Amino acid sequence: LIILLGGVTVNFILGFFLYMMIMFVWGKTVVTEDNLNSGFKVSEVMQKVGFNDGDKIISVDGKELVDQFEINKMLFTRNISEVQVLSENGERKIINIPENIGTKMMESGQMLSFIPVPDLVIDSILPNMPASFAGLQKGDIISRVNGSKIYGDDDFENSKSVNADYMELEILRGGSLFDLTIPFDSSEKIVGMNIKNQMIKLTKLEYGFFDSLAVGFDYGYWTLYDYVSQFKYVFTKAGASQLGGFGTIGKIFPASWDWQRFWETTALLSIILAFMNLLPIPALDGGHVMFVLYEMLSGRKPSDKFMEYATGIGFFLLIALFLYANGMDVILSLIHI
């Protein structure tokens, strides 16, 4: 039994060890609540649950959420029951999460149900145009247009159409809010300014050697947990359509060489291989372990004929899965041509 589990054990150890060393060498980059000035743009599925555009995540099941980006993964895989949010108006509220939220995310195709909203910043002002006459300056952050909170370029363009002759802006400059009214220069509603999305600030967490061991182990544990939790979706129609083979694995690696990304991907694949090899499918280590445990508990060894048939069936299942996964790669690549 120890020999049969040797390869699986080495893969698990390698994956966890790599995550520990990654935390020690590079640390971890997160997006904190303070980094998200405008909160999240929330999907329709999450709006039905009770979330709203502009929400920030404070805690999940009573524990502070350090990395705001984690919320999508946690909702999908970790069976959380409640989320505390800070609304755009400053109100704190607790939202109860339905048990089937992961299935709803999968079926709707809204896996990224929380998309961080970058600040909309004025990049340049054209001279002798309505924007310059109104007093707008480069670097001003647009908060509201015609009374509506802005969550990206689309909201900005849609809000311009509310009034026919002018646009009311609430801007943030130097920590203070200003209200400005800009008349349109023509029927095309030209105001003479260029806007851009400001990059969301990241916070880097660095760890000493011993701290990195604990943080890396925790990261590896949750990586394994999330992967195992996602496995149940493979047997759904939506999940089966997203299976992939070598092409999908290749896309995990970055287009240009990056040592951190390389080792992160290697650690992930090591943990995935360890889990997959433990599945009770004949021809895999997990299948052999299953038969050995049966022999140990019953005192009877399965017949050679039975083992031959079982191994053949297991091999057939693996080949079928291999062909299906790589076939999906081909189909998806043709669709996106």
Name each model-derived stretch.
Residues 7, 46, 54-57, 83, ...:
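Terminal peptide-recognition signature
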Residues 11, 269-278, 318-325:
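Alpha-helical transmembrane segments of multi-pass membrane proteins
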Residues 109-133, 141-143, 148-149, 153-275, ...:
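Functional transmembrane alpha-helices
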Residues 1-18, 60-105, 226:
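Interdomain regulatory linker/hinge segments that flank or connect interaction modules
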Residues 1-43, 306-315, 320-322:
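Internal alpha-helical transmembrane segments
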Residues 25-66, 106-144, 148-151:
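PDZ/PDZ-like domain segments forming the peptide/carboxylate-binding groove
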Residues 22-34, 283, 298, 330-334:
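Membrane-interfacial segments
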Residues 18, 322-333:
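Membrane-helix cytosolic exit motif
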